[in-house]
Amino acid sequence: MTILDGKKLSEKIKDNLKKEVDELKTKGITPGLAVILVGDDPASHTYVKMKRNACQKVGIYSVVHEFPESITEKELLSTIKMINENPNIHGLLIQLPLPKHIDTTKILEAVDPSKDVDGFHPYNMGRLVEGLDTFAPCTPLGVMEIFEEYEIDLKGKDVCVVGASNIVGKPMWALLVNAWATVDICHIETKDLAAHTKRADIVIVGVGKPNLITADMVKDGVIVIDIGINRLEDGRLVGDVDFENVSKKASYITPVPGGVGPMTIAMLLKNTVKAAKNFAKEVK
């Protein structure tokens, strides 16, 4: 059994990105990322801090626009418009979740697709489904990088994706299909989850339920990608997979923490550098 070490791979990617950023700076372009953060959610503040630290490490300029939970949709849209028009900012990230009185879809659709480094804009999602060059959401993109690094061939593989969110499940499906995998996507209404996971060569899960995937639900030699992140009452961080027992049957498995999580942030940086490179081509 091989542990798929996302932490180690993310450091390697960041080292390479730093070189790319240094090269862009010689052309007078410093990649810039703006983050919109609304409210006092501790997890959101922690994630934003991690993203800013990662930006600093590779030389990306980052700025956070913080707003109280009471901000109006109109005020938020006005800020997005200002960032869209700023040539020094190449990527714009809306830290989710947003307060209930804000229409999240409307906000995400207001982001300039060329600055949509989270890959959530319908324009970029459409291009992703068509297999065209675009910004893919960071977590599924990170999973694909893990497959590439460990030389896991996806062609013809039966893959079960558990979770059908717009952020992970649906874009994960698109990336896998584009890599010629046969993809089965499961969700809250799936009747017999184990029937789907048992026949899969690869199981990818990201729903936020500890121990959802147990050893009796997978076959020997399975490859397991655990995107879930859950904090237990004792303070431990665990994924959606019963790691201790499933790892005994798996050929490859990601740990939590240290698996997909670090790759998500690395892909945000990669998308931001890509956006800056696209901008550099336009201003030539």
From Swiss-Prot:
The organism's place on the tree of life at top rank: Bacteria
Pfam families associated with the record: THF_DHG_CYH, THF_DHG_CYH_C
PROSITE patterns: THF_DHG_CYH_1, THF_DHG_CYH_2
EC number: 1.5.1.5, 3.5.4.9
Keywords tagged on the record: Amino-acid biosynthesis, Histidine biosynthesis, Hydrolase, Methionine biosynthesis, Multifunctional enzyme, NADP, One-carbon metabolism, Oxidoreductase, Purine biosynthesis
GO molecular function: methenyltetrahydrofolate cyclohydrolase activity; methylenetetrahydrofolate dehydrogenase (NADP+) activity
Annotated NADP(+) binding sites: G163, A164, S165, I188, I229
Pathway(s) served: One-carbon metabolism; tetrahydrofolate interconversion
GO biological process: L-histidine biosynthetic process; methionine biosynthetic process; purine nucleotide biosynthetic process; tetrahydrofolate interconversion
Reactions catalysed: (6R)-5,10-methylene-5,6,7,8-tetrahydrofolate + NADP(+) = (6R)-5,10-methenyltetrahydrofolate + NADPH; (6R)-5,10-methenyltetrahydrofolate + H2O = (6R)-10-formyltetrahydrofolate + H(+)
Any one cellular-component term (Gene Ontology): cytosol
Subunit structure of this chain's protein: Homodimer.
Family named by the database record: Belongs to the tetrahydrofolate dehydrogenase/cyclohydrolase family.
Function: Catalyzes the oxidation of 5,10-methylenetetrahydrofolate to 5,10-methenyltetrahydrofolate and then the hydrolysis of 5,10-methenyltetrahydrofolate to 10-formyltetrahydrofolate.
HAMAP family: THF_DHG_CYH
Protein name: Bifunctional protein FolD
